[in-house]
C-alpha cells in the first residue's frame, strides 16, 4: 500500500522552515486585524454608538486619528516572533506525527485519517503554544497599552519589566484557557483543511493542481486558500470565547495603563473571568470582537495553509 505524498518527501527541518515563513508572511498582512480584535475583546462597554470602539471602521479611524497608522501594527515584533516560532514548531510537529502514523500502521492511518489529523493538529498546536506563549503575552500588552500612557518602551523593555515587576510567570498569564482553546481549534482546523484539500476540492477539476509533485491529485493554490478559509471559520467560531478570556487574563495587573479605554475587568483566573464577564456584560460578551476576529481567522488560516503548501512545493522543485 503506497502512502507516498507531499508530506512523506519533506523533512522535519524543511517543514519547520515552511511553517515559519508562512507565519511571517501571514502575520505581516493580518496584524491590523489582530490589533482590532484585541482592542474589542478588552473593551468592557457594549460595542455600540458612544463606546470607545463601536464598529470596525470607527475603530480603525479612531486608532489612526489618536495614535497614528503605525498603531495598527502595535506589537508587531513580538507578533512576528510569535508567528514564526509557532508556525515552525506547529507544522514540523504535525508533519512528524503524521509520518509516524503512516509508517507505524498504514491501514489504520488511512481508516482513521481525519481523526488522526485532528489529534496530531491538537498536539502540535499545544507544543507550539507553550513554546511561543511569552511572545503572545508581550504582544498583547503592547497592543493593549494606551499610547499616551505607555508602560513599555518596546518589546525587550516590556519583556524585562514584566519579569522584574510581576515575575516570570506573568509571561504565561492566560496559558490555561489558551491551551483549552488552541488544542481543539487547531485540531478542527487541520482536520477540516485536510478533508477539503485532500478529499473534496482535489476531486473538482477547477481546484486541481496542474503540476503536482505527488502521486495523488492535489488541490491548487486557489483550492488551498478556500480550504484554509473555511477551516479558519469553523475552528474560530467553535472556540472563540476562550480567546476573549485569554486576552482579559493577559492584561491583569496592567489596568492602570488602559484607563482611557473605559471600564477595566479584574479577575483572578479562568472561571472567575468567565463568570464576571457573563454577569457584568452578558453571554454575548464572550463573542466581543468576533467580526474582526473572524476576518482575521479566515485570512490567516487561508494564507497560513496555502503559503505553507506552496513553499513545500517550491522546496520539492528545488530538489534534484
Where are these regions (language model features)?
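Specific transmembrane alpha-helical segments of multi-pass solute transporters/efflux pumps
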Residues: 79, 83-91, 189
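Residue-level signal for conserved functional micro-sites within the alpha-helical transmembrane segments
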Residues: 26, 83-86, 128, 300
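Short hydrophobic motif
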Residues: 29-32, 36
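Periplasmic/extracellular loop-to-transmembrane helix junction in inner-membrane transport proteins
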Residues: 63, 67-69
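Flexible extramembrane linkers and terminal tails adjacent to transmembrane helices
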Residues: 1-22, 37-53, 57, 69, ...
